[in-house]
Structure formats: structure tokens, C-alpha cells
Regions:
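Short glycine-rich, low-complexity segments
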Residues: 1-105, 109-148
């Protein structure tokens, strides 16, 4: 995905991919060299590695449901690239990938150019950087409450 094209959609609701465990609908918050930042209802802030994004869909007819009111002072981690993002998340509880057999959770304890090291339940998991599609780390916004 081209960073300059993605920057045109910041603040808009888009869908990442057409289906599958990594597909998400949310508001695009930022776009950098090889990552985008999406605020989703399910997972909060999710950082997607652009090399794994197959498509994105613009919400032109506003048919994609997104019921989160984003505060003006909402803060999230920004990074120039995916490696820099991972460096800022050391010693934090993260989730790698959204679902399926590739989903992992744990404390990010080490990052290098080839692998990340997660600790979870007494195990150290070494995961190849090439298999990381997305990361989230716990920043969430409550859904806007509808009046009944």
C-alpha cells in the first residue's frame, strides 16, 4: 500500500482486506512507511504491516458500521516504520495478528530485524518478523452508548 494514498484516508472509515481473520473495519488514524494505524471497535488501535494488506475499501456510501466517538485528545503510538513501533512496545502486553492459528499474545521482551520474542505463561515464543501481520497493545475506546 502506498503511504501517500493511505494518508488521503486518515480520519475516514475503511475496511482492511475483504475477509478472513485479519480483516477489520475502522477509522484510519495514521500511515507511515510500512504500517498503518486503524482504530477498530473490536480491538482498539491496531497497527497493520502494509506488506500483508491485500486491499482496503473506502466507506463511500457510509455502509460500514463504526460506532466509536473518538476524543479530540486521543493518543496512540506513532512510528516511522514497523520496526520502530515494535521498539516502543518492549515490555508491554501485545497481541500479534488478529485470529486463527497465527494469533499470539504476551509480553514483548525482545525485538531484532528477524524475530520478536514474547513471554506468555512461562514460555518464550520466537516469531519471525515476516509472519507478523498486525499488532495491538491494549489502547481501546468505549463504544458510544446509544440512547434507548
Amino acid at each position: 500500500m502506498n503511504k501517500d494514498i493511505m494518508k488521503c484516508f486518515i480520519g475516514k472509515v475503511i475496511r482492511i482486506d475483504r475477509g478472513g481473520p485479519e480483516s477489520r473495519i475502522g477509522m484510519l488514524l495514521d500511515a507511515s512507511d510500512n504500517l498503518i494505524v486503524l482504530l477498530t471497535e473490536e480491538d482498539g488501535v491496531v497497527y497493520f504491516k502494509t506488506s500483508h494488506i491485500k486491499s482496503f475499501t473506502d466507506n463511500m456510501k457510509e455502509q460500514m458500521e463504526f460506532n466509536i466517538k473518538v476524543p479530540k485528545d486521543f493518543k496512540f503510538k506513532k512510528a516511522a516504520n514497523f520496526q520502530d513501533l515494535l521498539d516502543t512496545l518492549k515490555l508491554k502486553w501485545i497481541q500479534i495478528n488478529r485470529g486463527g492459528p497465527e494469533k499470539l499474545e504476551g509480553v514483548l521482551c525482545e525485538v531484532n530485524k528477524d524475530f520478536v520474542f514474547l513471554v506468555n505463561n512461562g514460555e518464550i515464543v520466537r516469531l519471525s518478523m515476516s509472519h507478523i501481520k498486525s499488532i495491538s497493545y491494549g489502547v481501546k475506546i468505549e463504544k458510544a452508548k446509544s440512547k434507548k
